[in-house]
């Protein structure tokens, strides 16, 4: 029973960690909220009762796409550390993440924490050179 409770707390702890890291403004709270929606939508998708049917009005892939497309703003205002990114480098790095041939690629996004780690990496890898 204790092990099951710990399993339930790990995703919650990851969400709290990300929420605290990004809770510096309404903008960052919006990104944090989007990640929570992605997590919730992913949980719904995994329910065995209705295999293959997405929940009405919620698409985690659409939310991830929106998050990535606004990632330059996220990097500048919410990432740790906050960085300005080069738009071309950001696009190239984002394409790598979505290519499934990268250590932080979409194929490894099995939790909100791993998605957050990928976003942090994306910001660092596309940072503007001075």
From Swiss-Prot:
The keyword Signal applies. Disulfide bonds: none annotated. Its main location: secreted. Induction: Expression is up-regulated during U.virens plant infection. Secreted effector required for full virulence of U.virens. Inhibits host pathogen-associated molecular pattern-triggered immunity including flg22- and chitin-induced defense gene expression and oxidative burst. The Plant immunity suppression domain is sufficient to retain the ability to suppress immunity-associated responses. This is Secreted cysteine-rich effector 2. The lineage of its organism: Eukaryota, Fungi, Dikarya, Ascomycota, Pezizomycotina. The gene is SCRE2.
């Amino acid at each position: 029973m204790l092990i099951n409770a710990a399993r339930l707390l790990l995703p919650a702890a990851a969400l709290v960690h990300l929420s605290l890291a990004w809770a510096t403004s309404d903008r960052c709270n919006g990104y944090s909220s989007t990640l929570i929606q992605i997590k919730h939508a992913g949980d719904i998708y995994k329910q065995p009762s209705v295999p293959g049917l997405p929940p009405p009005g919620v698409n985690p892939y659409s939310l991830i796409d929106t998050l990535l497309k606004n990632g330059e703003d996220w990097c500048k205002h919410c990432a740790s550390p906050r960085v300005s990114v080069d738009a071309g480098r950001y696009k190239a790095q984002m394409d790598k993440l979505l290519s499934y041939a990268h250590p932080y690629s979409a194929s490894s996004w099995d939790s909100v924490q791993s998605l957050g780690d990928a976003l942090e990496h994306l910001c660092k890898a596309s940072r503007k050179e001075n």
